[in-house]
Amino acid sequence: FTRLNFFLDNYDGAFRLSIDTMNKNIAKYALDNNFEILNDVSGFREPGMIELAVEKSSKIILVHSHPDASHIQEKMEFKDVVQEVKAQLEIKINYLISKGIKESQISIDPGLGFGKTMRDSEILFKNLDVFCFGFPLVVGYSKKKFTEILNMTNYQLYTHCIDSGAALVRLHIAS
């Protein structure tokens, strides 16, 4: 917990905190220490993560992860990446709700770059509006290889996300 403790020791409460982890123990520690949002890039596959989110009533970011992938970076084949990712997110949302997660806890992220080719991520990025179907949309394009083929400035990438309905855009900004 060293990295978390360093951050928490210097946190002044000025903004909401989200933890990006697949590890239940780290997630629990973070939620016990002022973090409000659980972002699990595995799509909440790890044992105990769903139960923890239910117990803590934490907001969650459901990142798309192909159900047949053995790990989050395994490249999967899609016939229609937009429709398949949307359908898989809908199935996972229904599963989470059946396990006690409330709709109001859920935000969705199409998982750009996770288990997808650069072309798949490009297509998803160009069709972000499809993922605005009743849940806040979170987009993380920053530092992703596929953005190189879009030939857009960072401002244009960000504006596209907002214009497409994103509620939150995750960025990496160096100081």
Language model region names:
Residues 90-105:
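Phosphate/pyrophosphate-binding loops at sites that engage ATP/ADP/AMP, CoA/4′-phosphopantetheine
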Residues 112:
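Active-site metal-binding loops of divalent metal-dependent hydrolases
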Residues 1-17, 24, 31, 36-90, ...:
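Active-site-adjacent loop and "lid" segments of alpha/beta metabolic enzymes
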